[in-house]
Amino acid sequence: GEINSLVADPAETCARVERHYTDAALSITRVDGLSMEFSDWRFNLRASNTEPLLRLNVETRGHDELLREKTEELLRIIRKEHSDRTEGKALGRPAA
């Protein structure tokens, strides 16, 4: 499901994620946020239009462990700006 993260600067956070994965990506599109595809997995990261949130969707080709690994990896990159702060914690609940 979709995972929301509170971020101060959605555009910069998307750019940071893109820089991290760009060399390994098979394709990159920016039609609805940032979508990157790899051999066994892909993700879409898009900004909310109404809140300071990024919404993350990660998919794999049936590899549950890879799904968990890549989701955790992406969330560490996305939420990096909040790692030293106690206020404005990232939201880890799925979107309704």
Feature annotation, model-predicted:
Residues 1-57, 62-96:
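Phosphate-binding and adjacent anionic-ligand microenvironments
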